[in-house]
C-alpha cells in the first residue's frame, strides 16, 4: 500500500516538475495544433491597388478543427480576425468548405478542417498606404482529436506588404 501511495506522489511530482520544463523547451500546450506555413500575397501592393493575402495553415496529424461554419451551434468554429491598419480596407475572409467527418461517439458528421487549409483575405489599399506595411491577424480555433476537444487557441499571424520598385 505504501508503495502505491509513493508511486502516486512520484507521478504527481514528476508532472509538476517536467511539464514546465517541457514548455520551456518549446513544446506546445495541449490543443496548440495549428501552425502557420506561409502568407502569400497575390497581386502588386501599390497605393490604390488591391491584393489578396493567402494564409496557409497546417494542422498536426490526427487533429481537426471545426470549420468556419460548424455543423452544430455549440461547436467553436475557426475564425480569422484581421486588425485594421492605416491605408488598408479589409474584405471578407474566404474560408474553405469544411470536410464532412464522422467521429466515433458522435451521431452526426462534423464539418472540419484537417491537414493543410488556406484562407484568403482581400485587401484594398488606399492612395495613402505607406509601405512596408504589417497587418496583424489572429486565427482562433479549437483543435480536436476524435471527440476529444481542447481549449480554444489563438495563432498570431502577420500579413506583410512591401511595394515593388
Residues of each region from the PLM?
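Bacterial N-terminal signal peptides
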Residues: 7-19
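Extracellular/lumen-exposed scaffold segments
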Residues: 23-165
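Positively charged n-region of N-terminal signal peptides that target proteins for export
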Residues: 1-6
